[in-house]
């Protein structure tokens, strides 16, 4: 039996002309936005966790308010992987007039330093004592990375001289030996620090390492003790445990988004420098690697003389070396970093150390830390550098006695 009148009424009530469907969709969208905003404001903005010994903790709380203030990640991309990806896609590339310098290494290699000068600094008019910020990029990065350019600009705005240490081959220069770089070998960083201190012996030097560069800074500080030539260190998104890092990067989504593209870029560096490398290993086999672990097994651990990849990862992991660090270093990490899992952070060691402080944000990803609705310019990393460098260069009177603290007094 047909009910033409009922059918007609139902069709009419659901027709687009009556606005029922559009009103429903609008209501659902409004509800979705409200739920999203409610979740964001209830769960996402949080104060970072600051883990340090009591004197260093008090120093940071007093001179670096960013360490105790709520971090508000960008509203529309606060998840860790999104923060990591959008930092690469969205950040602007400010123009920095670098002056490049080639350094030769004791083993016959070479790499580039890129200097950014502030010749008429009103804060530090004496160029012999003008503070220097030494920046170390990520594993395949250089002085041209947007995050490095922004940090260099921040250093210049604050009146400092900036210099970027480009790992061998990362600025396009050819390798002169079979060795590029690895996270456990700090010989090139030692060459850089000595070179800077010879030229500017009276200038305080702060090393800022990002990701792979942060691992180098931590390992360098652990190896040199108080004789490293640095007044302090700052790391951002450093990977504390190499085993945990490669495990995290080999999960399906992280492998697709990060591991495979990063490995491909490193393989291109090896292939581009085939001539010196093929003297010690099979280049064709090495560049078939599809993961960081495979490349480290086939190239890095072999080139740097390790028994195997596990031995290299053990030597490269700063997680076990916190007690050996005797220079103040602030370490910024995000709990949702796909490269550096939070369970690998050395919380207890930092709590007992007078020199190492961990600044852990709930969000931020890997070299992300985007904040504000339109995060094209500055981000949380810039603010951390600005306040920490100022604290180190202007208020260092609170730092020399850190070593007299008793380890039991640490807190978080």
Swiss-Prot record:
Main EC class the enzyme belongs to: hydrolase
Presence of the UniProt keyword Transmembrane in the record: yes
Glycosylation sites: 18
Keywords from the UniProt entry: Glycoprotein, Hydrolase, Membrane, Serine esterase, Signal-anchor, Transmembrane, Transmembrane helix
Location(s) in or outside the cell: Membrane
Enzyme Commission number(s) of this protein: 3.1.1.-
GO molecular function, one term: carboxylic ester hydrolase activity
Transmembrane recorded as keyword: yes
Gene Ontology CC terms, in alphabetical order: membrane
AB hydrolase-1 domain segment(s): 131-372
Signal peptide span: none
Organ and tissue specificity: Widely expressed with higher expression in liver.
UniProt similarity note: Belongs to the AB hydrolase superfamily. AB hydrolase 4 family.
Protein name (record): Protein ABHD1
Organism field: Mus musculus (Mouse)
Lineage of the species this protein comes from: Eukaryota, Metazoa, Chordata, Craniata, Vertebrata
